[in-house]
Amino acid sequence: MTMRTNCFLLLTVLLGILPMSNTHANDSIPKSVILYTPYTKISVSPGASIDYSIDLINNTDKLVNANLSVSGLSSSWKHEMKSGGWNLSQLAVLPKEKKTFNLKVDVPLKVSRGSYHFVVSAGEAQLPLNVVVAQQGTYQTEF
């Protein structure tokens, strides 16, 4: 009976410690570089131009020089990233600061209705975005 009691106590102690150490480990992992925009899912018409204002936030104690990219967009969806009037492919952010850049996405006139997903990346940081095209597009514009 003493052996059974000791095993039960050991099991109780181990089960009590494991969840706390697991939770603590997850909470201690900081997100060092973050991309942010409040407009993560929007609805537009074919032919629209979308202008995103995106913050690159550096929560580290070191300078971050991040490569910027957009993935997941078809070649018919033209896009450009700018800040200060310059086209960007890389952006430097001082420690504990943020920099804002603009992403312009042109929705083609000939596009099917539906939801389109793409990702903006800055180094390892990723910002998933979603554009919903509410109506079927055509080649013609209305005048």
Where is each model-derived feature located?
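Bacterial N-terminal signal peptides
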Residues: 10-18
